[in-house]
Amino acid sequence: MKDLLKFLKAQTKNEDFDAIKISLASPDMIRSWSFGEVKKPETINYRTFKPERDGLFCARIFGPVKDYECLCGKYKRLKHRGVICEKCGVEVTQSKVRRERMGHIELSSPTAHIWFLKSLPSRIGLLLDMPLRDIERVLYFESYVVIETGMTNLEKRQILTEEQYLDALEEFGDEFYATMGAEAIQSLLKDINLVKECENLRIELNETNSETKRKKLTKRIKLLESFIQSNNKPEWMILTVLPVLPPDLRPLVPLDGGRFATSDLNDLYRRVINRNNRLKRLLDLAAPDIIVRNEKRMLQEAIDALLDNGRRGRAITGSNKRPLKSLADMIKGKQGRFRQNLLGKRVDYSGRSVITVGPYLRLHQCGLPKKMALELFKPFIYGKLEVRGLATTIKAAKKMVEREEAIVWDILDEVIREHPVLLNRAPTLHRLGIQAFEPVLIEGKAIQLHPLVCAAYNADFDGDQMAVHVPLTLEAQLEARALMMSTNNILSPANGEPIIVPSQDVVLGLYYMTREKINGKGEGMILNGSNEAEKVYRLEIAELHSLVKVRITEYKKNKDQSFIPKTKIINTTIGRAILWMIVPKGLPFSIVNQTLGKKDISKMLNTCYRILGLKPTVAFADQIMYTGFAYAARSGASVGIDDMVIPVKKLNIIHEAEIEVAEIQEQFQSGLVTAGERYNKVIDIWAAANERVAKAMMENLSTESVFNKKGEKQKQISFNSIFMMADSGARGSAAQIRQLAGMRGLMAKPDGSIIETPITANFREGLNVLQYFISTHGARKGLADTALKTANSGYLTRRLVDVAQDLVVTQNDCGTHEGILMTPLIEGGDVKEPLRERVLGRVTAEKILIPNTENILIERNTLLNEQWCDLLEKNSIDNVKVRSVVNCETDFGVCAYCYGRDLARGNLVNKGEAIGVIAAQSIGEPGTQLTMRTFHIGGAASRAATESSIQIKNKGIINLNNAKSVTNSSGKIVITSRNVELNIIDNFRRTKETYKVPYGAIMAKGHGEQVNSGETVAKWDPHTIPVITEVSGFVRFVDMIDGQSITRQADELTGLSSIVVLDTAERMTIGKDLRPSLKIVDRDGNDVLISGTEMPAQYFLPGKAIVQLDDRVQISSGDTLARVPQESGGTKDITGGLPRVADLFEARRPKELAILAEISGIISFGKETKGKRRLIITPVDGSDAYEEMIPKWRQLNVFEGERVERGDVISDGPESPHDILRLRGVQAVTKYIVNEVQEVYRLQGVKINDKHIEVIIRQMLRKATVIKSGNSEFLDGEQVEFSRIKISNRILNKQSKIPATFSRDLLGITKASLATESFISAASFQETTRVLTESAVAGKKDELRGLKENVIVGRLIPAGTGYAYHKERLNRRHTVNTNQIKPNNSSSQISAEEASASLSELLNSTLIQHDHT
């Protein structure tokens, strides 16, 4: 028995491992893998189909072709297992060893491995410090390289051409040794003393100052260090033995007709073997050098093609003119091993069919066609039939099922009971694309789907198909039921709002039911409850919409979960009273006592979930759906052509617009307006006309006049079907109705510009040919956009998932006090997003105090739920510091407190939740809804761009942030500092509005003053930037010489003369160094100092500045000295939509980016060069000044002598996130990216929670650059994983050594994915070759921390239910390591399961043998 056990143990390999290491293979290593040398290029004998001996498919090397049978047939059967046949030399074993046994080829001449040679940066080139060109010339036998110099003046590694070599031979004879080919490179690599070389380089690094040289040296040091640490030898990058892939991985299959289908690898191997054998023969014959050399070069090329075809020179093609697939091609790309087979496995058995509506289903059910269920649950049915004794064998059971006997259907019913199935609709963009349902057997062939889950699947019933999968194991069924059941996924993981929301018919039905009507039948009745209301409606005593009084009993939920009833008579309508019947206990009547639109219904479900929990909500949702369908049918809403009422005023409006356009045309012809102005004005006129028509139409549609009980005329909301559909949010929008009954309006040309003649007709009137033609542009552009968009959006999602896949919640609390300060998002006078929406579901980072007191309102580490948020609003708190993933201190993963609420469940997030993937899906899934367009600023947008004043909307107090100001001669306040923020604050100290106030704005009211709504508080000229004096005195011109630095111009209309400063480019040579400026002096001509500084008041004027003062004029503070015209930005494209999101996550530097101040200090300008000016910032504390060259054409926001803070904007433009991170820190960059991304999604009306974007930002910030390494193991300037630096510094601090200093880096998502610690994950993402080359040289170890690596190696992922499994595994390992079992008795210790499994395997195989006999 013991022997049997030992034997079985040997059969099953140990598969338990914790990490995967990749490194270079030494020749001995390759030989140790190999089971024999492949000597012949033959594959199989085409007559007998038996593999040739010593060939590429040789059975002696790779194992038998048939299970337990040698090639010549002497030994067959299991009893001979392990015997090696003396005749044919084949070991008798399973044939699957042909998938794992490797062979090798002994190369007659060493060959360079192309990956280490040509994959940039070339590793061989870096190690030898030789240019790649030279190495290639040596390898491909074009030049010699000196290896031993001897007593000559040649240098080691010097390249010699044929002539130079011959000359040197004549001169020095045998003194030196030079050669060519891979042998030369190999001996050079062998000669490198890694440790010594490394030391020399470090010394050199400390002595050099040139930046480029330092970079090169660090690269070499890093490479050498990685060789030393990984125990790789450089000469292993040159192959002397070539491994041969197991034959079953490069199959050769006979087709009928005597032909063979073969893997390309066989061709490539054959080439190598042929050339290698020929080379061997030539060497034995001592052939002439030139022939041998040519053969060696050909061998090198053959091996290059085998490893990576097409990397160097032209790819080798097969018989069909296609390049052959090499080993590298096998693993990379979408069709490669990683993405096709390891990450993208197909499901073994599933069904698929068209979907139809199942309006009678419950939320957790789906209709499954009987035929399909029978097929999917076959094995279960067979099992049941056998257990019941209804069938004796599986074969008999199979027959019964095939005949579809009556008993089979009963069994099927039993099997299916409470066995969930998974439904999946492609494309699965987020986790709600696969949900579990309990199947209900139905006739027919289509799957029936519950209408409420359509939103999650993004499904409709116009021919969509869905796939059905059966979870087999008990665990799988449990997970399907507990985690994936549709009833457990009521909230969307992206924003925490219900995703099970009624749409279309249901919304229309509920809307119709809850509408009110004046003077309806039965108005004014008093009813004793909902039942009576339904009764009078059914008996047609009253209409659905009549206003009545009803006795309603509401139930309020108590703290102890009991309900307190409260009855009162409420004014409502019949329909609302009927609807109240389905509302669960615990909700107030007020939620149905209103006209319910789509938003209100969603809110109603949300309230229900928050107050009553999951079960009542699910039941309520179902009831809502049934009721909605029923009453939509009763409403009889339909669309007829008469419902599209065209307003009477339309003709008039259009006529007026045409007259205005004609006027402008006349002005243009008489030369009063330019062509551009005319075009813009015409478009404005038509846009306004369209608005007027639309308004008239909506007024017309949305109201009707009726007589009330007293016979007076009254207006009420209309019951027009089209209006009801749009108003309820069931289908359609005001914009679509406008096209049906208003006018279609302006159309765009394919290039995006607007055609100035609008389509005045609407769809009811019909379009003429020209109008129809114009409108085809837009439609086609839309279709083309959609196709592009889908692909781009999918790629964005893939990159996001890849960068965030390893982020999992791993601990409860990391204990950090850091956080993000959340304030309401206010733009101008509108609150874009109130504070409660931003902090809901977050954890507080510090105590929140009641304003103006020391009392604690909310403790630190409180999860803010709806009740807490109400409390915040009650105490009018307008900023809260909450914890954020970006600040989380957890080394690997995130802690639950920093993440906060699990949006799809409504409680604190669980350990093991894969928040990275959820974040990626939440951002990627709405990607297809974003536009692809880049907008031209046109029409409405440009009006917003040229604001020239601030008008207040709410009453309040003015609060100016970082403002400096002076009072001018007329007593008004003039702002003299930049990025001033004006906030309007109400009595509760809450910010209501925020505005940006530009430099030079004139304020009507000052800081702390009270303003009323509608007041204008600031004015400025939008087209020029003024230069404002801060002191009073007399103007003195400096360096302002007419014709050299300035020119005088007279205005034609006013006759006033003004001085214009010339740009340096426009000046003559004499004027180049002049720096025109205005100095302010007192009566005696002494400099006036700016108050509070030692600086004289001197204002330097930039080019193009206009001065309207004369020399020696008296001025007072706050007056304008000069004006700099703003070049109107013209139509700058703002990138919008999807491309903008991609740019943000890729952290791309924008074109013409804003220039920020690197340090705080005083601005001055130094010597100018041809196209640039020198900006100098001198710190106040006297440390070193900072200089920067700035192109002349940039408009600067600062003047000489102005004080700036680090991170202030010096020249406007889009800001680069890298600059923000460097100068303002992690918080600022997080805020910037979150706001910018949200801006894009908000425009499309998509809600995504901020924390998803923060999760991605955390991943973008996971690298840092070491500045000073201190006592750590890092190099200066090396880029390291941030968590590694943190861990290392923690250890160094404990030992009181010097920790490393570092700066955080922001990487784009593609870069960040490729820079992960896990090489398996990076290789499966992009640039597989480069990643694997780098990792092999460095001998990297993959700890298998992320999800992707574990999927690839075929394990449970360390998230979700797999999280517990991995923890358990680690604990088990830990206990095994601590109490090592004594070795002597461990051999016989084998678990019962293992023994039984092994035995059954053995018995099965013997049984099979008997069957055959």
Curated annotation (Swiss-Prot):
Stored InterPro entries: DNA-dir_RpoC_beta_prime (IPR045867), DNA-dir_RpoC_beta_prime_bact (IPR012754), RNA_pol_asu (IPR000722), RNA_pol_N (IPR006592), RNA_pol_Rpb1_1 (IPR007080), RNA_pol_Rpb1_3 (IPR007066), RNA_pol_Rpb1_3_sf (IPR042102), RNA_pol_Rpb1_4 (IPR007083)
One GO cellular component, as annotated: DNA-directed RNA polymerase complex
CDD domains, per database record: RNAP_beta'_C, RNAP_beta'_N
Keywords: DNA-directed RNA polymerase, Magnesium, Metal-binding, Nucleotidyltransferase, Transcription, Transferase, Zinc
Cofactor needs: Mg(2+); Zn(2+)
GO BP term, pick one: DNA-templated transcription
Pfam families per record: RNA_pol_Rpb1_1 (PF04997), RNA_pol_Rpb1_2 (PF00623), RNA_pol_Rpb1_3 (PF04983), RNA_pol_Rpb1_4 (PF05000), RNA_pol_Rpb1_5 (PF04998)
Cofactor annotation comment: Binds 1 Mg(2+) ion per subunit. Binds 2 Zn(2+) ions per subunit.
Enzyme class: transferase
Annotated EC: 2.7.7.6
Binding site for Zn(2+) 1: 70, 72, 85, 88
Keyword Magnesium assigned: yes
Role noted for this protein: DNA-dependent RNA polymerase catalyzes the transcription of DNA into RNA using the four ribonucleoside triphosphates as substrates.
Subunit organization: The RNAP catalytic core consists of 2 alpha, 1 beta, 1 beta' and 1 omega subunit. When a sigma factor is associated with the core the holoenzyme is formed, which can initiate transcription.
PANTHER family named in the record: DNA-DIRECTED RNA POLYMERASE, DNA-DIRECTED RNA POLYMERASE SUBUNIT BETA
Family, similarity comment: Belongs to the RNA polymerase beta' chain family.
Full protein name: DNA-directed RNA polymerase subunit beta'
Organism encoding this protein: Buchnera aphidicola subsp. Schizaphis graminum (strain Sg)
High-level lineage: Bacteria, Pseudomonadati, Pseudomonadota, Gammaproteobacteria, Enterobacterales
